[in-house]
């Protein structure tokens, strides 16, 4: 099949899952077309059966904000028509599902049939979806999807509770390739981050308030009173500066390290003794 995958190309979970899914499908012989505004961070190289179509965003003096949904819709119409796609798979309800529906209707008027699947990932429902101004669009685009999936049972239940959903939602959990995480020679990397053989405690997130990263610092502070430990912070986001300041204020300067965004977390998770994720809410926890 020729499949178009629409995603956010950033370090967030939905973009990573969408990228890895596309790569896996390409290995099975499907032709995958990623459609987004920049190359996905986990798409390190274009390989056989994988193509990337950039949604170019221009600044128009008339608009205070770039109308990304309309630009994306036009790009979807173009790629479906030119590449003769069989299916669109959109990850994250806003604005991808509504853009896919608009593209579907435009193509339908030209005699081209293109179904689309919407996958719900979490914050598109639990956070963004709570804004009443988005509710009609989210409800409409989910109901108009040819198929809808959610990454967990709890997310499915939240979606049904918050929106007037008339269509079936199938739960398809996120996935991980265990073989990729079986690293044998990681002592050198561990020695660099924990030279005194400290217990390594790791947090990975997009540093938003919902991740409750202040609690990570509090927990680590208590642990470090009794054990030799090292706190590894992976990721970036709006709360990072605040959390860094907190660490400098309450922790020994040699007991924590901020690594920023990593394209792959395989190495750091392999050397970690504890992974801590005290989120207020997670659609797909561990």
Please give the residue ranges for each predicted region:
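N-terminal strand-loop element at the rim of the active site
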Residues: 7-11, 23-68, 169
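Nucleotide-sugar donor phosphate/pyrophosphate-binding loop at the beta->alpha transition
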Residues: 108-117, 123-141, 157
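Carbohydrate-associated surface elements
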Residues: 154, 175
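A short helix/loop element that forms part of the nucleotide-sugar donor recognition site in Leloir-type
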Residues: 181-195
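Conserved donor-binding/catalytic core segment of Leloir-type glycosyltransferases
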Residues: 149, 195-211, 217-220, 232
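An amphipathic, basic-hydrophobic alpha-helix
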Residues: 62-88, 97-98, 102, 132-136, ...
């Amino acid at each position: 099949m020729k499949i178009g995958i629409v995603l956010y190309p950033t370090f967030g979970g939905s973009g990573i899952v969408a990228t890895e899914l596309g790569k896996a499908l390409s290995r099975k012989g499907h032709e995958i077309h990623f459609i987004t505004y920049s190359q996905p961070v986990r798409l390190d190289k274009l390989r056989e059966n994988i193509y990337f179509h950039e949604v170019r965003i221009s600044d128009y003096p008339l608009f205070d904000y770039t109308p990304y949904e309309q630009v994306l819709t036009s790009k979807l119409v173009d790629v479906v028509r030119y590449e003769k796609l069989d299916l669109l798979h959109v990850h994250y309800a806003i604005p991808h599902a509504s853009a896919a529906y608009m593209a579907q209707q435009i193509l339908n008027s030209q005699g081209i049939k293109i179904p689309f699947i919407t996958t719900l990932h979490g914050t598109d429902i639990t956070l963004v979806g709570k804004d009443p101004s988005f509710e009609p669009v989210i409800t409409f685009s989910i109901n108009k999807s040819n198929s809808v999936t959610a990454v967990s049972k709890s997310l499915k239940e939240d979606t049904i509770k918050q929106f007037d959903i008339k269509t079936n939602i199938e739960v398809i959990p996120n996935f991980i390739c265990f073989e990729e995480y079986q690293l044998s020679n990681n002592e050198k990397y561990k020695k660099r981050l924990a030279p005194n053989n400290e217990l390594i405690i790791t947090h990975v997130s997009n540093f938003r308030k919902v991740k409750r990263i202040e609690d990570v610092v509090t927990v680590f502070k208590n642990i470090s009173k009794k054990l030799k430990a090292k706190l590894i912070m992976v990721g970036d986001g709006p709360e990072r500066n605040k959390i860094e300041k907190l660490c400098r204020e309450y922790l020994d300067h040699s007991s924590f390290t901020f690594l920023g965004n990593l394209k792959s977390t395989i190495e750091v998770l392999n050397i970690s003794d504890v992974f801590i994720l005290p989120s207020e809410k997670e659609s797909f926890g561990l």
